[in-house]
Amino acid sequence: MESQQLSQHSPNSHGSACASVTSKEVHTNQDPLDVSASKTEECEKASTKANSQQTTTPASSAVPENPHHASPQPASVPPPQNGPYPQQCMMTQNQANPSGWSFYGHPSMIPYTPYQMSPMYFPPGPQSQFPQYPSSVGTPLSTPSPESGNTFTDSSSADSDMTSTKKYVRPPPMLTSPNDFPNWVKTYIKFLQNSNLGGIIPTVNGKPVRQITDDELTFLYNTFQIFAPSQFLPTWVKDILSVDYTDIMKILSKSIEKMQSDTQEANDIVTLANLQYNGSTPADAFETKVTNIIDRLNNNGIHINNKVACQLIMRGLSGEYKFLRYTRHRHLNMTVAELFLDIHAIYEEQQGSRNSKPNYRRNPSDEKNDSRSYTNTTKPKVIARNPQKTNNSKSKTARAHNVSTSNNSPSTDNDSISKSTTEPIQLNNKHDLHLGQKLTESTVNHTNHSDDELPGHLLLDSGASRTLIRSAHHIHSASSNPDINVVDAQKRNIPINAIGDLQFHFQDNTKTSIKVLHTPNIAYDLLSLNELAAVDITACFTKNVLERSDGTVLAPIVKYGDFYWVSKKYLLPSNISVPTINNVHTSESTRKYPYPFIHRMLAHANAQTIRYSLKNNTITYFNESDVDWSSAIDYQCPDCLIGKSTKHRHIKGSRLKYQNSYEPFQYLHTDIFGPVHNLPNSAPSYFISFTDETTKFRWVYPLHDRREDSILDVFTTILAFIKNQFQASVLVIQMDRGSEYTNRTLHKFLEKNGITPCYTTTADSRAHGVAERLNRTLLDDCRTQLQCSGLPNHLWFSAIEFSTIVRNSLASPKSKKSARQHAGLAGLDISTLLPFGQPVIVNDHNPNSKIHPRGIPGYALHPSRNSYGYIIYLPSLKKTVDTTNYVILQGKESRLDQFNYDALTFDEDLNRLTASYHSFIASNEIQESNDLNIESDHDFQSDIELHPEQPRNVLSKAVSPTDSTPPSTHTEDSKRVSKTNIRAPREVDPNISESNILPSKKRSSTPQISNIESTGSGGMHKLNVPLLAPMSQSNTHESSHASKSKDFRHSDSYSENETNHTNVPISSTGGTNNKTVPQISDQETEKRIIHRSPSIDASPPENNSSHNIVPIKTPTTVSEQNTEESIIADLPLPDLPPESPTEFPDPFKELPPINSRQTNSSLGGIGDSNAYTTINSKKRSLEDNETEIKVSRDTWNTKNMRSLEPPRSKKRIHLIAAVKAVKSIKPIRTTLRYDEAITYNKDIKEKEKYIEAYHKEVNQLLKMKTWDTDEYYDRKEIDPKRVINSMFIFNKKRDGTHKARFVARGDIQHPDTYDSGMQSNTVHHYALMTSLSLALDNNYYITQLDISSAYLYADIKEELYIRPPPHLGMNDKLIRLKKSLYGLKQSGANWYETIKSYLIQQCGMEEVRGWSCVFKNSQVTICLFVDDMVLFSKNLNSNKRIIEKLKMQYDTKIINLGESDEEIQYDILGLEIKYQRGKYMKLGMENSLTEKIPKLNVPLNPKGRKLSAPGQPGLYIDQDELEIDEDEYKEKVHEMQKLIGLASYVGYKFRFDLLYYINTLAQHILFPSRQVLDMTYELIQFMWDTRDKQLIWHKNKPTEPDNKLVAISDASYGNQPYYKSQIGNIYLLNGKVIGGKSTKASLTCTSTTEAEIHAISESVPLLNNLSYLIQELNKKPIIKGLLTDSRSTISIIKSTNEEKFRNRFFGTKAMRLRDEVSGNNLYVYYIETKKNIADVMTKPLPIKTFKLLTNKWIH
C-alpha cells in the first residue's frame, strides 16, 4: 500500500481509475454523511456555485440541449406538453398514471424502449407522491431542515415516507467531473431524503430500511441519469452500470461505504491530533485507545511513524506527565512502546500500586517480533482489518516504480500480505520465513543482471511501495512462488519468482533488513524509500546520503541521469546455492530474435516499418516469423524517447499533386542542415540531403561550410551519380530560398545543365516538407544512435549515413516497397550490418614488433560505400578505417554506457546473424586478407584528431612493484586501463588542430623529447643528460596525488610539450629508479636559491620543483606560512598534471643542444616553445600543430609567418602615429537619426513605434520643464556660440523597446559655454567588480535602479539656447534651456553634483574617498553610473528605504529588486550577470555580443571552424610602409576603430584573457595593413566563438576571517617593437578575478628582472587603492599579496644589499618598490611560471597553455 503522510491525506482520494477499493470496517451507528460540519458547508457551497449558473433561462437548466426539456414552471402553471408524458422536471403529487405504464413486477425486468432509455424520459406511477420542482430548477440547495436532517430516514415502511411530502424540492446540481462524484452523491442522497425516499437509502450495513417500489426505482434511475451524465461518472460507477444499468442502489451502497471509511479516518486523525491525558483514566485504556487509532490508520494506508506518533502523544500530556515532553523530546529514536512504559510508571506511582501491578517493561526479544514499525504491545500480533469483508471488495494495491503489488491469496491472509508492502510483517502461512531461517526448497530464479543504467546500484524510488530486485544472489530466507502480483502503472501483471529479505551492512557497521520481491522482468532494481522509512532510514537529497533519524550517515547517494542510486556494496550476499530456474530453455534453432535487438539493429525504426520491410523482403536473411513481436506494441525504447523527442508532427500530404507525374530521379528535394557546434575541425558542421520524389531514395553529403563552391561540388556529384548509375536526368530540384541556393553561381550551373530550380514561395513552409521531414528524421536517428552507442558527438555524420543506408532499405507502409526496390536495387542483407557503435577488434597489420598486440579496439559505424568493408572508428589512433578484418567484441568489458539492451544483451543474436562471416582470428583461417586497414578516402572522418578518454598503457607499464605507490593503486589503474581501452570515449576535445590527422605508419620506438619552455628572462636552459632523477618520498606522494586529478588524464601528453627540463630533480609518475643522477632534496634546492646572490645582469634559471608554490624567503614564523597558504588557497590557479618519465636514446646523448635565437615580435616573437624538436619520430607534435591557427578567408593572409627580426631602418609613420593615438577608439554607432527612424523608414510598424517613443520623449521634456516655453527667441538676436545644435536619436534596446532621446551636439559646443574644470564622474569598473565580489561573499541583496531622464533634474547655470523639436515647425526660432540636456559638456557634472548632494544630505550616505560615485553608510553601498544605481545591502529593507527616499525626488524605476533566493539575472552596465545569493555569480556578455558582432560585417565561422585561441605565437607584424590611397586608408582605419573599440569594451569588462591581443592591435589602429586586419578578424572570430564564456565566481568560504587581495604580475622581456617589454597584472579578491591590465612598458628594460620589477611597481598603486576601498565597504581585515614568477625580483625586494644596482634608475625603482612593499604590509611570494595566470597578459601562448591558465576562472 502506498505510504501517505499525515498532512497529505485526502478523504476524496477514493474511486480513481487507477486505484482499487478496499472495503473497511464501518460502525453501524454512525451516519456516513455526517463527516463534519465544515465539510457539509463546503459541499453545499459547491452545489450552490454549480447551480447558480443554471437559473436564468431554459438554456441554462440541468439538461439544456434536449429539445424535450422545457423550463420549469410554478405549480399553478401547467407545464408544456411535448409528448404523452409530463416533463421530467415537473414531478407533482397528483400526476395521473399514463396508460400502459404498468410493467412487470420486478424492477430489473422493466422493458425500456430506446426512447425510454433517454435521460429525458420519466413515466410516473399512478400514485406517485414525488414532489414537484420549484420554478428555480437548478438553483443551489437550501440548508436541510431539521426534519430532513443530515441523516438517513429510518422509516419502517414506504407509507411513512409518503405522508410528509414536501410540495417543492430542489434538485441536486449537475455532476461536472468524476472527481466531484463523492460530494455530488451527498447532495443526491439529501435530495432523496427531501423527496420522502430516505427509507430506500442503504444504511451503514448496506441494506435499506424498506423495499424499494417500481415507481421509486424508475424515479431513482431517471434522476440519476439526468443529474449524473455518464461521461462524468467515475470508472467504478461505470463498471457497475455496465453489468446492470439500473443498479443505482449498489452505487449508493458503495458510496456510503466510502464516505463512512473517510469519516472514520478523519475522526481518527482528529482524535490523534487532540489527545489529552493527565492520569485521570488508566494508562492501559489510554494506550489501547492510541494504539487502536494508529493501527487503523496504518491499515487504511496512512502510515504514522514512531516520531510523529510520539510527538502527538507528548503534546497531549499534562499534569505530572507533562515533564515527559521535555525529557523525551531530544530522544530521536524513541518508540511509542518506550513512551508508554514511562507513562505506565508514572501512573503506577500515582496509584501507589507499583508492586501489585505487572511490570510493563518487555524483553528486547518481544520488541523485535512486533509486526509494526514501532513496538507498543507485549506480544507480537497480526492485525487483520475488516474481517467481515464482502465478496466484491478488492485488496488495496501498492505502487512501486511503475509497478504495484496486490495479493491473490484468500481473504483471511490478504491483510497480512498487503501490510508487508510498507513494513516488516509477521507471516502466518506455510511460505512465511523469518530472517535467519534456512531455505529448504526454493525455486528462486538467480539471474545475473549487470547491465543496469548505473551498474551495481539500486534505484531509489519514493513512489515504490515494495522493493524489487532482479538478481537472487542477495535474497535471504527466500520462498518461491509467493501469492503476490506485481502490477505496473498500466495495470499489467508482472510475475514474481520469490519473496525474501534484503540485508544491508552500512558504514557504521549496523545491519538491517527489509522485504524484497524477486523478478527478472523489470528495467531497474528498485529500493523502496517507504520500506526504508519503516526501519528508520531516510534519504536526504540535500546531502545525498542515507541516514537515520538521529542524523547518522549510513551510505552515500549517487545522482546519475534523472534518478538517485545507492550502491549494492552495502548488500549482504546470500549463501544459498542457485536454485532451479523456472524459465524454460529454448533451443538455439527455435529461439526468435528479440524485437529490441532488431529495433536497434535497424537504426531504431518503428515496428510497423520493420514488419513491412520483412514481409516485402526489403530486408533479407530472415523472415518476419523469426522475430519475437510480443513486446513490440508495448516496447518503449529510452534512446528513441530521448533522441526523437519532438513538439508536433509535420503536416502530411502537403506536396503539390503535379509532382507525382515525374519519372524516377527527375524531381529532387534538397535541404541543408546545420551548423553543429563544438566539433573538431575535421568533422563537418553541416550536411545536405537529397530525396527523389518518386522512389523516395535519399542521399546525404557532409559539408564543412555553406559557401557557393562547396554547394556546387555536391550538386555536381549528385547529378553525375544519378546520370551514370540510374541513366536518368534530373529535371527539377526543389529547394528553399536560402542564400546557398539562390546565389548566382548555382543558378548559372542549373541553367547550364537544363535543370529548373523550384523555390518555395513566401510563407509556404508546407511545400518543402519532404526535405525538412527527412532532415528531422535523420537528426532524430542521429541523436538516438549517439545516445545508444555512447560514441562522441564528432561522429554525428556517421550516424546520419548509417541511418540513410537503413532508411533506404525499409519499406514504406504506403507503397509497400523500399526506396531501394523502387530504384531497382536489391534488398539490404542485414547479416552485413552491425549495430551502430558495436565494439569490435580490428587487426593491426603493421605493429611495432612481433610481440606487439595485433588487435586495436574500435567501434563499427556503417558499411563502406567504396569497398566491401566496414567503416570503424579507432579511438587510440584517432581515425576511422575501412576494413574487413575485424571481430565483434563480446563480454562484460565491451559494455557501453547507456542502457541494458546494448550490444552485450544481444551477443548470441549477433553471432547468429554474422555466423557466415569468419573472423580473422578464427582457428580455421589460412589465408590473410590483402585489404588490411584500407583507409577510406571518401570518408570525411577518415582521420580524426582526438584526445581519447583513456590513459595510455605506458603509465601502467612504467610503475614497478618497488614504487612507493600502494599496490592497490597499480591494480586499480591496470583494471581501468584495460576497461577504458574498449569503451567509447564520451567526450572529445573540440579544439584540436587539423594538421595532426594521420599517425605515423610505423610507430617509432623512440619517445618524443619534451619541449623546453622559456623562463621569465626569456633565456634557455641547456639540457644536461640524463635528466631523470629518482623521486623522493614527498615527490612520489605529490605525483601520486596529481595523477588522480580528473581534469588532466593525459599527463604524458602534457609533459611531452609543457615540461621545463633543468638540472634539478624532476618528479615522475612512473617512479623511475635512475641512479645516474644524485638525489637533491627540496630543502637543499630551496636553500641554494635563498643563499645565492641575486644576479642583475642575467636572470637566474627557474627552479622546476614539484612544489606548486615555493617561497623565496625562509619563513620565520608559523603565521607567515599560514598567510602564504591562505593567499594561495583560493586562487584559480591551474592544476598541473604529473610529469611522466622520459627516456632518451643513446644517439641523442651525442647531439648538441638546439638553440633558438630571440626575435623581436609584436605578438611574442620568441620561438621558445620549439627549442627542442622530436628526434627520430615522423609524427608531428600535437602541441606544435595547435599553435598553427589557420582561418580560411580569401582575403586573409595565408603566408607562413616566421620569427624574423624586423629591420629597424625603415620609417613607419603610421605606426608611430598609432602608438601615440591609441585612445582614438570610436564606439560602434547603434543609433538612428530622425530621418532614418521616421522620415524615410519603410518599416511601418517600426516607424510607428519610433513615433510613439518620440512623443513620449517630448512629453517628458515638457514635464521636466527642460526649456522656457513662455518665450521664443529669434536666431539673429542670440550670440551664435550660445546656440547649441540639437537632434533626436533613436535606438532599439535589447529588451525590444524603442527609445527616443533629445540630445545636444556637445561635440561642437563652444568652450566658453561650460566650465572645463567640472568633472562628470561615473563609478570605476574596479569599484563595481569589488562591490559585486563582496556582495557574493557576504550574501548581500543586489538591487538595480534606473532614474528616468536623470540629467533633466539638474539645472543649468549658463545661458544656452537650442532649436525647437522638429514637430513644432519653428526652424527660425530658439528656446532657452533651463535643464541639463543630454549631450551638453556640463550635463554630466551637473547631474553628479545634484545626485551626490541628495544622497549625502537626504539619504545619509557618504562618498568613499578616492572612489567617485561609490557611496556608503553602515548598511547600504551604492554604485552610481549616470542614471543607473546598484544597491548592495545585507538587509533588503535597507535598500527599500533608500528607494523610498529616492522616489520622493526622482522618477525612480526598480529594474531588479533582487529579493529572490533563486538565480537572478541582471544587466548592469553592459555586464550580463547571473547571481544566486550565497552560492555563485557569473558575468558575461553573450546576448550583447550575439547582437553586436554580426553588425561589424566580419565574416564569421569560415569553413565552419572554431578558433581555440585568440592568437598564435611565433608571428610578428610586418611593418612595411602602406601603399594604399587615402580613401581606402580612412575606411580601414574606421573599420579598425570599430573592431578594436568593441574588443576593448568587452576585454576590460570581463574578458581579461584577451587584453594582450587587444592592446597590441590597438597600437596599430592607424596602421591597418592586411596582416593587422587579418589578426583583428581572428580576434573578433575568437570572441564570436567564445561569446558564451563567463567569468565565474564562487562564494568564499564562510570560515575565512580576512579579505585577501592579490595581484599576480608577469612581464615578457623585449618582445614588443623597439625591444619594449609587455607587462601584465591580474587582480583577485578572495580568489575571484576582478580585473586585469596588459600594457607596453613605457621605458626600455635591460633585463628580465628589470621588466618584472616594472610590472610589479605598476600593480602596487592600484592594489593599495583597492585595499582602501575594500576596507571602507567591508570592515574585515585585509591581507595583500603580490605573486610573481621571478625569483630574482623577489630577492631584490627582500634584500638589503644596494651594491649591485647597475644604474641609478634601476636602483631607485627597486628601492621604491622595497619601500612600498614594507610600508604597505605586502606579502611577496613566488609562483611557478606554469601556474602564473598573468602570463596570458604578456604574450601569445599555445592553445593548450592558454586553456590551462584560463579554464579555472573563465569558461
Swiss-Prot record:
Integrase catalytic domain segment(s): 660-835
Recorded catalytic activity of this chain's protein: DNA(n) + a 2'-deoxyribonucleoside 5'-triphosphate = DNA(n+1) + diphosphate; Endonucleolytic cleavage to 5'-phosphomonoester
Gene Ontology BP terms: DNA integration; DNA recombination; proteolysis; transposition; viral translational frameshifting
Site description Cleavage, residues in chain: H401, N402, N582, N583, A1217, A1218
Binding-site residues, Mg(2+) 1: D671, D736
Residue numbers binding Mg(2+) 3: D1610, E1652, D1685
Domain Reverse transcriptase Ty1/copia-type: 1338-1476
Biased composition regions of type Basic and acidic residues, renumbered to the chain: 1038-1053
Compositionally biased region (Low complexity): 153-165, 402-418, 960-969
Pfam family, one: RVT_2
Gene3D superfamilies recorded: Ribonuclease H-like superfamily/Ribonuclease H
Motif Bipartite nuclear localization signal mapped to chain: 1178-1212
Compositional bias annotation for Polar residues: 1-23, 48-60, 127-152, 1005-1015, 1054-1082, 1101-1111
Subunit structure and binding partners: The capsid protein forms a homotrimer, from which the VLPs are assembled. The protease is a homodimer, whose active site consists of two apposed aspartic acid residues.
Further comment: Retrotransposons are mobile genetic entities that are able to replicate via an RNA intermediate and a reverse transcription step. In contrast to retroviruses, retrotransposons are non-infectious, lack an envelope and remain intracellular. Ty1 retrotransposons belong to the copia elements (pseudoviridae).
Protein name (Swiss-Prot/TrEMBL): Transposon TyH3 Gag-Pol polyprotein
Upper taxonomic lineage: Eukaryota, Fungi, Dikarya, Ascomycota, Saccharomycotina
Underlying gene: TY1B
